[in-house]
Amino acid sequence: MKNLVKNVVLITFFMSFIPVSYAQDDVEEVVVTANKKAQTAQEIPMNISVITEQSMLERGMAKPEDFLRTLAGVSTPGGDVYYTIRGLNTSTAQTSSGTTSTFIDEVGGSSMHLFDLARIEVLRGPQGTLYGSNAVGGTIRYITNKPNPDEMEAAFSFELGTKSKSDDSIRSLNAMINLPINDNTAVRATFSSSEDPGIYQNIATERKDIGKQEDDSFRITLLHEDGPLSVMARYGKAESDDFGQKEKGNADKPGSADIVNPACSYSAEWYYGDTCTRVFALAAGSNFSYDPDFAFYSFTDEQEQGETSVLTEVIKYDFGKFDAILIRADYDFETTAITDWSRIDTDDLYTDILYYNSSGSRDTTELRISSKPGDIEWTVGYYKERFDSDPGPTEVEPTDAGGFDYVTGYMGFTSHSGGYDPTLYPAPFNNPYLLYGSYNYYSYTEEKAFFGQVDFKWDNFVLTAGLRDFELSDGFKGSEYGIFYEGDLGCDGTSASGTTCSEENGSESDTRPKFTLSYIPDEDLTVFLVSSVGYRNGGNNAALPPFCANDPEAAGFSRRFKSDEAKNTEIGVKSRGDNYSLNATYFWVDWTGIQVTVRPACGWSFTYNGGEAETSGLELDFSYNLTSNLYLDFSGSFMSAEITNDIDSLGATAGDRLPNVAEQQYNVGLTYDFNVASNPAYARFDINHYGDSYATFAEDNEDMSPSYTKLNLNVGVQLESSYVQLSIDNLTDERTEAFRFSAESPGYRPRNYLQWIPPRSISVQYRYGF
């Protein structure tokens, strides 16, 4: 594999120089702001992909899931939020992006709807100098269309479709209006709503719509420009409602758990092997008609609802010799969820629901000063971010009378010396059948940083040097309640028995550099060399509960973990001619002090610095105009991602492949422009190949998501100010696991999580704008 990559790199670099002499007369430049200043995608010294508004339309992209698996170097277990770039992932069960960051314009955030966006910028490689923590593998930026004072604009679209394996319809509605107030001021408002039907079936509750996702969002933006002054204010709000189990591998997208095996016979025995559990047997005894490929058995249908709002102010001023920008963002968020814990605590015999609630705020401030274009260009800035969670109950887990007697029975009433009485706890933990609860007194993280970057230009060369000097601090204080704790009397020493107290604080500081050297002999060729470093914030773990003490996966537990470091080196070339463009990059990353998130089968989780890894590979973006109206494009990556040290608690040995990483992936697209009754029309056909991946280091077949090839078709026609488009996703209805994870410890409670790639969907979309 490594020799193949090296050979492809050499061939690609050699070929990229051959057609340089064919100059382009007319080049439609794509301008990006990835380096906090306007540059063309051709000249910027990094591997960047740009998805334009027109490309989103032609490819039928409505949500991030539609493009994430088509990008070179991007791996995701599915869904719209969680992804990794360049293989930088070690979590055996990925529930946070961790090594990547996402921005909407100048502030952190993600867009669930790809509507009224000017473009999407995908920045590969560590971006810690300008974008701070978590931009280890890269950054994705959603660039919105801004208010336009010159004219009134309006647009709307609606989509209606069907999805294989679901009786419900795909629905989406988007609307935008732009209103000029005067020559210098305008307001722009957008609204989006979507519903993606579920395909999973819960035998216990006899529901066949598990996995349904509903998302609503709006934003309203005011822009005022007066000479050197520009002021933009925006308020946005997003709401989500996900109905279904969010499996360990991907807390973003509902999936299924413990797919029914028809070969399992009904029995009261606890354990039949790795593929037959008690839930299989219970399901086999049900009269509910179900599809075994999509069915599972869970006492309770899980649900999660989220709400996020953000107020943003951006003030720019042109001082003549330099530009200054102040960016402020205030976030408020709340998440509520109900999850089924009958698998963990009551052995699928009794109802056991864990109610979760989290709310808080996040404030960010960035002040940046940049020079004007010239032989020496510089940017310096200050950044501050503060996150605070609201005090209050976060988790409450009551069972019923039967479940309570069952748990106290198998614990032999050894807990609390046989005198466990949850009614002595404060509300809402005073439920007589409470098994577990948690309370947050405070939790915060804070990051402060000074950063700078300077470009030196001479002849056809540009040297860039950057540095970020950061300080991190964080802390929390909380209590836990329940039958699993005894003897503790809380933080003040006067609480009822079984009330723990956890308090931890910490801080650290460090620097992260960046250097690039680019050679630009003309507007059609750029060769660049990059050395950059990324990092993730350190933090604290809550105390390990006693019921996890003997779990082998908890062997590496410690109360504090620090920032990790990813040192990236890459060499790339961007070349274009009359009918082609090529972007090729070879990278290698040395990742140390890795924050490994461990989620033992006991139901807990913690993070520690326990890993070292290396990733390397080739990323290719290529387009070629076959004729004046037939266009070919290719985007793909071929990489190696391996751990370089043993991690006993995860069963990882040096040389093992990093989890949830597809080492090969590519997307080939063919677009054909034509006319229908004198109206412009297009047809686009995509072949998307995604390589296999494993949820754990062990590379066990039970944790393997196989490779697949999916076909998509989009056909559209423009009718004056409107578009009509037919989209078919997964044309052949390919059935493959997008994510699969088996938790087999402890052996009597195995859990098998599964998420299919989206089945075939057929939809019609209508867009109108003026």
Annotate the PLM regions.
Residues N174, V314-D318, D323-A329, F333-T339, ...:
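Membrane-embedded beta-barrel scaffold of Gram-negative outer-membrane proteins
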Residues D26-E151, I571:
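Acidic, small-polar-rich N-terminal luminal/periplasmic segments of exported/outer-membrane proteins
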Residues G98-T99, L114-R119, R124, T129-F218, ...:
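Outer-membrane beta-barrel translocator/receptor signature
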Residues L222-E225, I369-S370, D375-E385, Y441-V589, ...:
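Structural signature of Gram-negative outer-membrane beta-barrels, strongest in the C-terminal barrel
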Residues G374-T379, K457-L463, S581, Y586-W591, ...:
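Gram-negative outer-membrane beta-barrel transporters
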Residues I199-D209, Q245-Y297, D340-L354, T394-N440, ...:
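Solvent-exposed loop segments that connect transmembrane elements
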